[in-house]
Amino acid sequence: MSKFLVFGHQNPDTDAIASSYGWAHLEREVFGRDAEAVVLGTPNEETAFALDYFGVTAPRVVESAKAEGVSQVILTDHNEFQQSIADIKEVEVAAVIDHHRVANFETANPLYMRLEPVGSASSIVYRAFKENGVIPPKEVAGLLLSGLISDTLLLKSPTTHVTDPQVAAELAEIAGVNLEEYGLALLKAGTNLASKSAEELIDIDAKTFGLNGNDVRVAQVNTVDIAEVLERQAEIEAAMTAASVANGYSDFVLMITDIVNSNSEILALGSNMDKVEAAFNFKLENNHAFLAGAVSRKKQVVPQLTDAFNA
């Protein structure tokens, strides 16, 4: 039987790594298939905290599926090809487990797709465990809980589904942690930005979206002090510009999210700033503007940008 590689998106966040780790376990232990969870980039500090807390060795980083000798892959926490492994079009996508929009995606063969509008891909993976009558091991439950906490900012994001609090409670019990205490510690681990270069900062959690012929890069960083991040605006803008030139982005939008007060500052550069301003009904001043109540790229930024670019 051929081996499957299971992975989340480029610039992996906690949910991308947790969901792929959990699904690979399900493939091996429940479905009896050879599957390995791998990652498309080095885990960030938040994810590293979760891995260390639950005693899990970080999955190895891969750059090419074909180079690994596999012909089939399973995607978690993404489906858009530009967010996936470099040679995604050269292998068969056997399954997708995701909670995002479907775009820039097609396959030659039928596949298993599980798409749910829930707070995290990890939520879907846990549901699959339950449906198969299996309780995930403590470390798997801990990672899945971490993925859900990360993506929903401890269930405060508008992306939180009505079923997610129960999922979180059950996973916390299996993992043996206090949901609030562990959740705050996890999120705090992801806000250490001072040690990051500007280039690293804008790449911590970044995705490219094809919007009406434009490649728009949308990145997000979590902080407890937006002003502290903006003190580095000049070097951050230089990094955004360099990344846009190197990769052909028409626009670069950075969400600087205050996880305590649930607001964001939008810092944006590019050739379509009129569309960015129209998307959020604000005026950029010195390339940035405040976006009250915004914490979710998926629900409060990308759909609005999509509408504005297609207008």
Curated annotation (Swiss-Prot):
Residues that bind Mn(2+) 1: 9, 13, 77
Cofactor: record remark: Binds 2 manganese ions per subunit.
One Pfam family in the UniProt entry: DHH
Tree of life domain: Bacteria
Enzyme Commission no: 3.6.1.1
Protein residues bound to Mn(2+) 2: 15, 77, 99, 151
Alphabetized GO MF terms: inorganic diphosphate phosphatase activity; manganese ion binding
Keyword Cytoplasm: yes
One Gene Ontology CC term in the entry: cytoplasm
Catalytic activity: diphosphate + H2O = 2 phosphate + H(+)
Entry keywords, A to Z: Cytoplasm, Hydrolase, Manganese, Metal-binding
Cofactor(s) needed for function: Mn(2+)
Cell compartment(s), UniProt: Cytoplasm
Family classification: Belongs to the PPase class C family.
PANTHER family: BIFUNCTIONAL OLIGORIBONUCLEASE AND PAP PHOSPHATASE NRNA (PTHR47618:SF1)
HAMAP family: PPase_C
UniProt-listed NCBIfam families: PRK05427.1
Protein name in the entry: Probable manganese-dependent inorganic pyrophosphatase
Organism whose genome encodes this protein: Streptococcus suis (strain 05ZYH33)
